[in-house]
């Protein structure tokens, strides 16, 4: 270790060079001139103060180097090389890593470099050079190729290149660079090049002037903003190695670029040693050189050198001694480096100095590096910004994707005080996009969900459903809901009863032993038996089946079991939901929930506690076995005891050859046929309890305050299966009484004189008689048992006898969430608190409409992010939106919640969301069936199912299929995002993109978890008033749910009709554009899976469109989105979406650019400011902007409070503090420019702006005015409209020009003037229109959809209006 090295420079590149050189065992001391604080911290490094040695005095540098025995001088920046430092050092015999002045021309003189490439056959873009602006511009306009790249020929710190979007921009660049000498003499000669298309990469090479060795390829990111937007910079980040260049292409670069360049230098007798940097464009015709540089690139160096394994000092020494060919270059394999540059505010135009930097890591590590570019320290040793590019955060990882994520995260932890830091969040994303583009496109089926299998199941079970039809049923499976006509029954005062049930872990036993039909029967029996408790006749049933992988024959057998139960009870199977959720359920795993609706006469509702008398009989009806209680623990303990359930059973039907599984899996007994006639007679049965939780628990429910009972098993046989179970698992008698039915499936309360149990209820036994509870009984149990233990002991003796093992409770009560549940006036509670619904008298021919759904694997996102409060809203939305499509007014809602580990707080959080959703849907929340089932679910996993009931007048049932005809209009109500379908595909996309739910969404400022959990929109309140009118004009509604646009709209069309949608007429939420790009999802698959921005589609007669839009346009952002057409070819799809690809591409292009920076100027309440804030923060609206500043000319106004609440910077600039309008506006402009504002919205800003201000912001300044311009400009416009007798008013968003409200119109929104209106009522109505129009206009402006204002004709705004 004997060598000393001098490094010239002070930036991040030099920091990285010093860091790498310090690792050499051959280097003892490194001097940096002038160096930096970061370099000073590197081992072996020492800064040389510029006061001691002037970096510009090359002779002094040479003299100092000789005196201090410097073995090697490494020149970092290009300027010293271009000015001849290398020549001075070489003359004095000091080795210099870097070429002399002649060699540096390859970078310093772009004209010379282009001529050099031409002379030596190096592939590059076509070009011409100029010293005259007019000639340059004439060439640009007439060139036979796209001459749009304009370069200053000299050195301009990496900023002297403009890649113009069009000829005008290129000519403007000529004027600035050559005409105005923006970069001084560097731009005195201009190079105009052909615009090449492709990816830009950097290949740096070491050369000794004879041989050349390429380094690993890297990619720099020159533009300031994400998506390569904004001005050129010195480089905002880089990554290495870059996979965009193939090995054959890299070999071509070695031969045709690097070696030809070195040979050319030799031919022209130019000595060159150091780095030869080739900036390349990977075109269709192969790599083309954009530029050469004569030094290490910045920031490429910072990501290349960490991957170099060979001693850097040895490499540099070999370059200077002409021995590079003898030294093998070694690179780290399987490692990627990504660097993210943090720049100060205002860069590249200005730089901020002296801002405190916090969050810097204490030290560098093998996987995390910080190199300083423009950083200084104060006296307290605190880090401060000291330039444009301040530092670079680097991460190394085996995965490029992980390295990028870690580098971006590291950058995000570092903050600059004051105006903050600028950094890109998309460094290396191009590499991923290429990988995505070349990867096969994802589909819903690829993610584990097969829509075709779901359709096949529907077709398979339709005959099963038809077999359960009974009077009252309308329609069939496959619509949005199940329909039942009450008039077909003979009830005078009908009351609707509802029951929701599950089968617990018994389904696991059924699946493992192929008892599919049994468990389906169980589900129906559990639900229907529950209705008997209310005295109700089961009339309609819905099922919910969830699984990891849908196996159609198995699911069909489950449904067959349900259908068998329905037939036995004369109840109709009217619909169901089958959810395939591979990320919630493992393959082969299932769960089920059932929902049964019954009808009971108002006077027959049970229980009738008011009729109870002492000595009333408690009668038990025998169960068929265990029914469905407690199977989670039973199966767990049996498995632990290694009991083989496939062996012949020693009890029950074992003597007939049944296995233990078959005995335990015996279906629940259905009591409907046995009890319903007596319940409807209404003269004997006072109460009914279905034993589902455990005999003691359910008998207790039959006892009102003041009654007790003793259950006597002396004459009541206990089935031997309970004895086997108790002996096998060493259970106590008490735990069986608490958790199982013990042979009693249903308990009735009958009068003492009743003989019903003897004459009409086979197997019925009197269990006990009701008694008045003694007043002094204290805390004694009100349900006592005798003769049970003795009987059970005998039954258990052959199997090991009784023990003390306890069984846990499986069915749970959800604790109160604090959310007040909605209760409609039709809803009431019976004597034990169960909710029922009266059918309102105003219905002439009421139709019950039932719907069920789940939330799908959106639940997984809630569970992973611990954000479970909103999925209940999704659940309600998915159900009520469906029944809304049948014209129903939702009345009640019930839910099913099953989980792995019971967490009361989690259950309460989810249930609170369900109740909030029910409230939004104006529905009574009836009940939630909740169960903890560790055998079915992982500890942190839960599933949800929902069941909605609505009522419609028969004359109002939708869809009106016969009335729909070509020419009918489609009106779309926007979705709030993904809603609750297609999330299995979302999970697949996230996995492919390497993104987590806590990562920031690529399409908004929120996290992906927050965006994806935006609740499904509930459309009930939006449409209820409209649907309640007799002639509302709506022929059909289609809820765009599972199956997307392609499969939901056809559900309301006859086969000979189709629809034509126009994607230009409604916004595509950015989330879908991102999903399509990240998952390479085809447009067809996207439309078949997602709502694509339309949550609900209305089919409306052409003459009724205006009336419907009048109700829905402003509050719901409804718009005309298409029309019904004749379907001429039955093989063609029924849904055609025109312009979808263009809309998708437009949105994706928008996402690749930075959000537009907007300022809002106010003077008062700021209601329009709030509308803009809300729209921008709702990513589904696609307003790709951010409000960065709010300015008020008045202090203390509400608008400032709104800004503060939203976290938006605001200020008061009072016009009273300035001598003139012009001076005031100059101050406004100063603050607007400091905030880098691009567009200004005037939202009630009560100032007339000066002409200079308007001209400076022309085309970027918009206002909202409360009239339909050009009518009524200026003030007091509502008064003018009323006095003029107008029948219509509204608002106008327009560009601001020098006149008063005379600028080009962007958007107009009309409202009617109604009889009796005054200024206040009209103003309020216009406000609603303003809150729709202003965000819409800003969306158009931010997206670039509007033409430049100079091209807009004021008198003909229609073109712009039509572009909405």
Swiss-Prot record:
Reaction catalysis annotation: 5-phospho-beta-D-ribosylamine + glycine + ATP = N(1)-(5-phospho-beta-D-ribosyl)glycinamide + ADP + phosphate + H(+); 2-formamido-N(1)-(5-O-phospho-beta-D-ribosyl)acetamidine + ATP = 5-amino-1-(5-phospho-beta-D-ribosyl)imidazole + ADP + phosphate + H(+); N(1)-(5-phospho-beta-D-ribosyl)glycinamide + (6R)-10-formyltetrahydrofolate = N(2)-formyl-N(1)-(5-phospho-beta-D-ribosyl)glycinamide + (6S)-5,6,7,8-tetrahydrofolate + H(+)
Entry EC number(s): 6.3.4.13, 6.3.3.1, 2.1.2.2
The keyword tRNA-binding is assigned to this record: no
Keyword ATP-binding: yes
Binding residues annotated for Mn(2+), in chain numbering: 291, 293
GO CC, alphabetical: cytosol
Region (GART): 1155-1364
Binding-site residues for N(1)-(5-phospho-beta-D-ribosyl)glycinamide, renumbered to this chain: 1166-1168, 1327-1330
InterPro entries per the UniProt record, alphabetical: ATP-grasp (IPR011761), ATP_grasp_subdomain_1 (IPR013815), Formyl_transf_N (IPR002376), Formyl_transf_N_sf (IPR036477), GART (IPR004607), GART_AS (IPR001555), PreATP-grasp_dom_sf (IPR016185), PRibGlycinamid_synth_ATP-grasp (IPR020561)
Keywords (A to Z) from UniProt: ATP-binding, Ligase, Manganese, Metal-binding, Multifunctional enzyme, Nucleotide-binding, Purine biosynthesis, Transferase
Domain of life of the native organism: Eukaryota
N-terminal signal peptide: none
Annotated (6R)-10-formyltetrahydrofolate binding sites: 1221, 1246-1249, 1263, 1297-1301
PROSITE patterns in the cross-refs: ATP_GRASP (PS50975), GARS (PS00184), GART (PS00373)
Gene name of the encoded protein: ade3
Protein name: Trifunctional purine biosynthetic protein adenosine-3
């Amino acid at each position: 270790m004997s060598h000393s090295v001098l490094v010239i420079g002070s930036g991040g590149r030099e920091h990285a060079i010093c860091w790498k050189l310090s690792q050499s065992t051959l280097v003892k001391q490194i001097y940096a001139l002038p160096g930096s604080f970061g370099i000073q911290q590197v081992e072996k490094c020492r800064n040389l103060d510029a006061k001691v040695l002037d970096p510009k005095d090359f002779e002094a540098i040479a003299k100092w180097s000789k005196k201090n025995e410097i073995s090697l001088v490494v020149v970092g920046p290009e300027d010293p090389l271009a000015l001849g430092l290398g020549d001075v050092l070489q003359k004095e015999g000091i080795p210099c890593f870097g070429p002399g002045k002649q060699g540096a021309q390859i970078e310093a003189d772009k004209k010379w470099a282009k001529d050099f490439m031409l002379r030596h056959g190096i592939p590059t873009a076509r070009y011409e050079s100029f010293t005259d602006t007019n000639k340059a511009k004439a060439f640009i306009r007439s060139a036979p190729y796209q001459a749009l790249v304009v370069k200053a020929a000299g050195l301009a710190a990496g900023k002297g290149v403009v890649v113009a979007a069009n000829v005008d921009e290129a000519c403007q660049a000529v004027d600035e660079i050559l005409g105005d000498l923006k970069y001084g003499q560097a731009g005195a000669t201009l190079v105009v090049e052909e615009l090449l298309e492709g990816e830009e990469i950097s290949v740096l090479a070491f050369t000794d002037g004879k041989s050349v060795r390429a380094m690993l390829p890297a990619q720099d990111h020159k533009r300031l903003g994400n998506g390569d937007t904004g001005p050129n910079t010195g480089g905002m980040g880089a990554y290495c190695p870059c996979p965009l260049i193939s090995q054959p292409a890299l070999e071509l670069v070695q031969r045709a670029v690097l070696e030809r360049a070195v040979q050319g230098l030799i031919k022209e007798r130019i000595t060159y040693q150091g780095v030869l940097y080739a900036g390349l464009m990977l075109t269709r015709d192969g790599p083309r050189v954009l530029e050469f540089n004569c030094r290490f690139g910045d920031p490429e160096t910072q990501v290349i050198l960490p991957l170099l394994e060979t001693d850097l000092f040895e490499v540099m020494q070999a370059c200077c001694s002409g021995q590079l060919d003898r030294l093998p270059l070694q690179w780290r394999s399987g490692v990627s480096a990504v660097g993210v540059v943090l720049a100060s505010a205002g860069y590249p135009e200005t730089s901020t100095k002296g801002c405190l930097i916090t969050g810097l890591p204490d030290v560098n590590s093998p996987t995390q590096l910080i190199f300083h570019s423009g950083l200084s320290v104060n006296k307290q040793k605190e880090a401060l910004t000291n330039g444009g590019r301040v530092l670079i955060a680097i991460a190394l990882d085996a995965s490029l994707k992980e390295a990028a994520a870690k580098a971006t995260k590291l950058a995000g932890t570092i903050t600059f005080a004051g105006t903050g830091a600028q950094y890109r969040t998309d460094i290396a994303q191009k590499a991923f996009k290429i990988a995505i583009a070349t990867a096969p496109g994802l589909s819903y089926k690829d993610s584990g969900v097969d829509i075709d299998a779901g359709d096949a199941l529907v077709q398979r079970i339709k005959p099963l459903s038809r077999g359960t039809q009974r009077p009252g049923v309308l329609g069939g499976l496959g619509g949005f809901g199940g329909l039942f006509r009450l008039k077909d029954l003979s009830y005078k005062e009908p009351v609707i009863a509802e029951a929701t049930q599950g089968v617990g872990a018994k389904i696991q036993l059924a699946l493992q032993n192929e008892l599919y039909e049994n468990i389906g029967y169980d589900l129906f029996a559990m639900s229907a038996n529950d209705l008997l408790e209310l005295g109700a006749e089961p009339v309609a049933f819905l099922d919910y089946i969830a699984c990891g992988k849908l196996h159609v024959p198995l699911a069909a057998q489950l449904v067959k079991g349900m259908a068998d139960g329905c037939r036995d009870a004369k109840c109709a199977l009217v619909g169901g939901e089958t959810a395939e959720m591979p990320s919630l359920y493992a393959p082969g795993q299932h769960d089920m929930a059932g929902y049964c609706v019954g009808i009971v006469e108002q006077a027959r509702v049970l229980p009738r506690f008011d009729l109870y008398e002492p000595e009333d009989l408690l009668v038990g009806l025998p169960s068929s076995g265990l029914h469905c209680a407690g199977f989670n623990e039973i199966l767990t303990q049996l498995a632990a005891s290694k009991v083989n359930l496939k062996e012949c059973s020693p009890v029950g039907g074992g003597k007939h050859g049944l296995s233990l599984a078959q005995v335990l899996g015996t279906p629940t007994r259905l009591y409907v046929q046995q009890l319903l006639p007596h319940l409807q007679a209404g003269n004997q049965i006072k109460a009914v309890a279905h034993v589902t939780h455990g005999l003691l628990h359910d008998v207790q429910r039959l006892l009102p305050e003041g009654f007790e009972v003793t259950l006597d098993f002396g004459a009541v046989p206990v089935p031997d299966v309970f004895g086997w179970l108790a002996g096998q698992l060493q259970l106590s008698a008490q735990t069986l009484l608490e958790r199982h039915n013990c042979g009693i499936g249903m308990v009735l309360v009958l009068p003492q004189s009743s003989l019903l149990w003897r004459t009409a209820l086979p197997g019925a036994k009197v269990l006990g008689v009701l008694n008045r509870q003694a007043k002094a009984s204290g805390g004694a149990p009100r349900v006592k048992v005798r003769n049970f233990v003795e009987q059970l002991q005998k039954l258990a003796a052959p199997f090991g006898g009784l023990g003390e093992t306890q069984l846990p409770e499986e069915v749970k009560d959800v604790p109160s969430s604090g959310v007040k549940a909605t209760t409609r006036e039709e809803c009431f509670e019976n004597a034990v608190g169960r909710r029922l619904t009266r059918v309102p008298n105003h219905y002439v021919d009421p139709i019950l409409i039932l719907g069920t759904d789940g939330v799908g694997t959106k639940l997984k996102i809630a569970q992973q992010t611990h954000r479970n409060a909103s999925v209940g809203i999704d659940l309600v939305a998915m159900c009520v939106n469906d029944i809304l499509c049948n014209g129903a007014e939702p009345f009640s809602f019930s839910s099913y919640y099953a989980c792995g580990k019971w967490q009361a707080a989690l259950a309460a959080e989810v249930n609170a969301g369900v109740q909030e959703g029910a409230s939004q849907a104006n529905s009574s929340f009836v009940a939630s069936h909740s169960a903890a089932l560790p055998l079915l679910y992982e500890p942190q996993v839960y599933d949800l199912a929902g069941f909605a009931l609505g009522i419609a007048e028969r004359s109002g049932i939708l869809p009106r299929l016969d009335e729909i005809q070509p020419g009918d209009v489609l009106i779309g109500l926007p979705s709030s995002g993904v809603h609750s379908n297609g999330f299995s595909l979302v999970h697949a996309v996230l996995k492919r993109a390497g993104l987590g739910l806590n990562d920031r969404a690529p399409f908004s400022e929120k996290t992906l978890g927050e965006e994806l959990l935006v609740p499904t929109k509930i459309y009930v309140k939006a449409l209820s008033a409209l649907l309640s009118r007799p002639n509302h004009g709506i022929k059909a509604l289609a809820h765009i749910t599972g199956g997307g646009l392609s499969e939901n709209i056809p559900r309301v069309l006859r086969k000979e009709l189709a629809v034509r949608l126009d994607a230009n007429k409604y916004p595509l939420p950015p989330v879908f554009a991102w999903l399509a790009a990240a998952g390479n999802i085809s447009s067809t698959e996207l439309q078949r899976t997602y709502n694509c921005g339309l949550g609900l589609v209305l089919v409306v007669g052409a003459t009724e469109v205006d009336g419907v839009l009048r109700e829905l346009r402003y509050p719901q952002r409804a718009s005309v989105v298409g029309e019904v057409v004749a379907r001429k070819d039955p093989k063609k799809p029924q849904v055609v979406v025109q312009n979808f690809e263009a809309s998708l591409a437009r949105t994706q292009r928008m996402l690749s650019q930075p959000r537009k920076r907007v300022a809002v100027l106010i003077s008062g309440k700021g209601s329009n400011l709030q509308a803009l804030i809300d729209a921008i923060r709702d990513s589904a609206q696609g307003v790709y902007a951010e409000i960065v500043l709010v300015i008020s000319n008045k202090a203390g106004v509400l608008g400032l409070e709104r800004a503060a609440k939203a976290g938006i910077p605001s200020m008061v600039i009072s016009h009273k503090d300035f001598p003139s309008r012009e001076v005031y506006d100059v101050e406004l402009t100063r603050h607007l420019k400091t905030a880098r504002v691009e567009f200004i919205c005037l939202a009630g800003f009560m100032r007339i702006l000066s002409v200079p201000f308007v001209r400076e912001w022309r085309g970027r300044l918009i206002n909202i005015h409360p009239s339909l311009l050009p009518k009524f400009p200026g003030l007091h416009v509502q008064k003018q409209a009323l006095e003029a007798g107008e029948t219509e008013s509204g608002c106008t968003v327009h560009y601001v020009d020098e006149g008063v409200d005379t600028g080009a119109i962007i958007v107009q929104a009309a409202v009617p003037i109604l009889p009796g209106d005054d200024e206040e009522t009209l103003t309020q109505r216009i406000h609603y229109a303003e809150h729709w129009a202003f965000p819409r206009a800003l969306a158009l402006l931010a997206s670039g959809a509007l033409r430049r204002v100079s091209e807009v004709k004021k008198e003909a705004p229609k073109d712009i209006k039509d572009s909405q």
